[in-house]
């Protein structure tokens, strides 16, 4: 088993971001957002999930899926951060 290079990891992330901008199911989209939020803010997946759950980020994604899943992923991550901050989050 070998570790992925940084370039391979970036390519995988880029592919996932492109897929997110296409039609994904709600569960897939929420999972992708949790993963990308974790990566962007250097959190583990469980910590990212708990943070987004506690400060209504996941609720926001659930309520606004129809609009959010067609926006660029970076915009959704920015909005998630803002929603969480409005609800007491400190990232």
Task: Label each PLM-derived region with a short phrase.
Residues 1, 23, 55, 86-87:
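Intrinsically disordered, low-complexity segments enriched in small/polar residues
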Residues 1-18:
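N-terminal amphipathic/basic-hydrophobic helices that include classical n-h-c signal peptides
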Residues 10-11, 66-91:
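Long, compositionally biased
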Residues 13-45:
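N-terminal acidic leader/helix
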Residues 29, 47, 76-79:
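Residue-level detector of well-ordered alpha-helical segments, enriched
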Residues 30-33, 61, 82-83:
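N-terminal, charged low-complexity regulatory/assembly segments
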Residues 38-40, 44-70:
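Amphipathic, hydrophobic secondary-structure cores in small proteins
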